[in-house]
Amino acid sequence: MRRRRGIVGIEAAIVLIAFVIVAAALAFVALNMGLFTTQKSKEVMQRGLEEATSALEVDGSVIANVTSGSVDAIAIPIKVSPGREGVDMSVDKTTVRVMLPSKFYENAYCGVFDGSSLSDSKLSTITSSIACTTGWAYLVIFNGDGDNVLELGEKGLLVLELPTPLNSYEEFKVEVRPVQGAALTVERIVPASLPTGGAVSLG
């Protein structure tokens, strides 16, 4: 009669340990895959949120410069939205679309200017000191570091030297589209009563 050799205790323990090690390795891989997928999902959601929200926001009242009873220039104060570090406002990275009563302009933007050389931040001072040859909308950065990026703590003034003046009750719309984030849209109506000259708040 043949004798059958059974598995002794030490061999069973070795097999069991091997199974445990393999199971632990598989669990580790599965856990890592899950964490990686979760992280990627968070990144996609964050990018989607950034694209859906504007990187810029209006920082105060929109100002109009009035000459001979009509608005000939507009200044929109803007800043970086909370949670953003900076927005590149270079002429090749930003588009400024303007809707006037008489015409729509696909892109009136001509770039960034440093406001540190100006004597003050009045709209009349800016328009008399800065010449924009490739368009009539430009950004002046105050408290900046000399580059084209609008950063936290810096003040931006988007100036529009209108090709045709605006009169009372007329409406305009400005859409600022940086390379990232949703567009910033500003709409205003010229007040019914305008002085012959000076600055007027449009709210």
From Swiss-Prot:
Primary subcellular site in the record, as a coarse category: other
Keywords per UniProt: Archaeal flagellum
Keyword S-adenosyl-L-methionine: no
GO terms under cellular component: archaeal-type flagellum
Propeptide: 1-6
Entry's Gene Ontology molecular function annotations: structural molecule activity
InterPro entries hit by this protein: Flagellin/pilin_N_arc, Flagellin_arc
GO terms (BP aspect): archaeal or bacterial-type flagellum-dependent cell motility
Family: Belongs to the archaeal flagellin family.
Name this protein carries in UniProt: Probable flagellin 1
Species of the source: Aeropyrum pernix (strain ATCC 700893 / DSM 11879 / JCM 9820 / NBRC 100138 / K1)
